[in-house]
Curated annotation (Swiss-Prot):
Organism: Mycoplasmopsis pulmonis (strain UAB CTIP)
Alphabetized SUPFAM superfamilies for the sequence: RuvA domain 2-like
Gene name linked to the record: ruvA
Matching Pfam families: HHH_5, RuvA_C, RuvA_N
Any single GO CC term annotated in Swiss-Prot or TrEMBL for this entry: Holliday junction helicase complex
Similarity annotation: Belongs to the RuvA family.
Free-text domain note: Has three domains with a flexible linker between the domains II and III and assumes an 'L' shape. Domain III is highly mobile and contacts RuvB.
Name of this protein: Holliday junction branch migration complex subunit RuvA
Length: 197
């Protein structure tokens, strides 16, 4: 799974950037072009959408924005175009609308109907209410980060055995985002070795 790349922004357009990473250039669709500056070096969270005809990349500056994009396009009737329109208003705002069940405001966005909004709320409200609740709380101990990372990895589709293996030697001082990234790397490394054997 491609989660992120480290690289440099070569060009910024209203709808996409050209991103250079490991001596290769990528055209990556984005939200909120004002968040991207030419010649800036950054970690870009990437979602890769592939079919038999083409591969399209979508880039995000925040991990949870990537997760929300993936959640939105999993809803019947919500494609990447509509998901980007929603996220262009700020992922935190859209996540809050979903968590609070505010389908009326969601229905005011272009190309999205009331049926779509009800489906989004039905399928995603509980998940994002928990996500946002965790953001608002200050953990009483670093072990809470392990718990949050475990839940995030479950939401991303990893199996319990994979998660246990990936987090058993984790650094408790790491934040949730770092724990998740390192866990995915560890799982991917093991999968790669198994594929070669």
């Amino acid at each position: 799974m491609l989660l992120y790349r480290l690289g440099k922004i070569i060009h910024v357009n209203k709808k996409y950037i050209i991103f250079e990473s490991d001596s290769a250039g990528y055209t990556i669709n984005i939200t909120r072009a004002e968040n991207f500056e030419k010649d800036r070096t950054l970690k870009l969270y990437i979602y890769e959408l592939s079919n038999e005809y083409q591969k399209t990349l979508y880039g995000f500056t925040h991990f949870k924005e990537r997760v929300l994009f993936e959640d939105l396009i999993s809803i019947n009737g919500i494609g990447p175009r509509i998901a980007l329109i929603l996220l262009n208003d700020g992922w935190e705002k859209i996540a809050s609308l979903i968590a609070n069940g505010n389908w009326e405001t969601l229905s005011r966005y272009p190309y999205i109907n009331v049926k779509n909004c009800h489906q989004i709320i039905f399928e995603l409200q509980n998940k994002w209410a928990k996500f946002l609740e965790k953001d608002e709380k200050v953990p009483s101990a670093n072990i809470q980060n392990i718990s949050d990372a475990t839940e995030t990895l479950k939401m991303l589709g990893f199996k319990r055995e994979q998660i246990k293996y990936a987090l058993e030697s984790a650094n408790l001082q790491d934040d949730v985002e770092t724990l998740v990234e390192n866990a995915i790397k560890k799982i991917s490394t093991v999968n790669g070795k198994e594929a070669r054997n």
